[in-house]
């Protein structure tokens, strides 16, 4: 078993971005805890479980926390802007592979969304079946990507990709 990185905010930020992409881009209502978009890391025990917690306004000054915020902003904005898609009674989720032991190949494949995440400390390759081959857009970079009906992604350690289709 590999040793997971627990104290490097560059790694933690990327993994949180991937987790939030997998979470917020699936159907049904979602909720986020205060400052969750910045990786709030104050213990629930601080000042008692229900006591006031410190506000960490300085989180915006940390580049990794800012990257987390920026990624979450794009992810949630895309979902909000596509309310017609998420508001359907049935949104087809073609693949949802997040519960297995393969930390390198977590995937979400829907008609308009593809998320592939690698939670390993090393590069990982994952192949997906895509029901909508053609041109997709990388949500975070704006880059256009051709994705076939069977497509292989190679992601670096703790990396992820979010592709969307209008």
Where are these regions (language model features)?
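Active-site clefts of carbohydrate-active enzymes
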Residues: 1-9
């Amino acid at each position: 078993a590999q040793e997971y990185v627990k104290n490097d905010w560059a790694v933690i930020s990327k993994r949180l971005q991937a987790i939030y992409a997998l979470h917020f881009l699936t159907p049904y209502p979602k909720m986020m805890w205060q400052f969750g978009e910045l990786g709030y890391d104050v213990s629930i025990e601080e000042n008692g479980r229900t006591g006031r917690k410190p506000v960490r306004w300085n989180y915006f000054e940390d580049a990794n926390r800012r990257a987390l915020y920026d990624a979450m902003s794009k992810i949630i904005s895309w979902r909000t802007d596509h309310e017609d898609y998420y508001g359907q009674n049935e949104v087809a989720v073609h693949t949802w592979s997040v519960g297995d032991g393969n930390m390198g190949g977590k995937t979400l494949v829907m008609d308009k969304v593809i998320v592939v995440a690698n939670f390993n400390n090393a590069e990982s390759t994952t192949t997906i079946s895509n029901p909508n081959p053609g041109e997709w857009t990388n949500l975070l970079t704006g880059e256009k990507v051709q994705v076939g009906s069977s497509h292989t992604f190679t992601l670096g350690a703790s990396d992820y990709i979010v592709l969307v289709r209008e």
